[in-house]
């Protein structure tokens, strides 16, 4: 079930997302967050975390770095600064 859900998100990333304007206010993007949440938490909790993240992604939220926490939560990662340097380094040095 987890792999099917990940395949659906990857389909969205490759077929649908490129034709839409950029709108995610977070890093990683909501679709990448969903995949990581599914991998870390399994299909049910991962889906709930991903949907909660999508609901947080709106013009009234400041956005920013919000990696998937190691423990299940429907709230924003309480300590994104712990990951920020690692994420920024990965983003700019992976090319």
UniProtKB/Swiss-Prot annotation:
Q: How does it sit in the membrane?
A: Peripheral membrane protein
Which compartments does it reside in? Cell membrane
What keywords appear on the UniProt entry? Answer: Cell membrane, Membrane
What InterPro entries does this protein map onto?
Answer: Membr_insert_effic_factor_YidD
Keyword Ligase attached: no
What Gene Ontology cellular component terms go with this record? plasma membrane
> Which protein family is it in?
Belongs to the UPF0161 family.
PANTHER family according to UniProt: MEMBRANE PROTEIN INSERTION EFFICIENCY FACTOR-RELATED
- Which HAMAP family does the record associate with it? UPF0161_YidD
| Protein purpose | Could be involved in insertion of integral membrane proteins into the membrane.
Under what name is this protein listed?
Answer: Putative membrane protein insertion efficiency factor
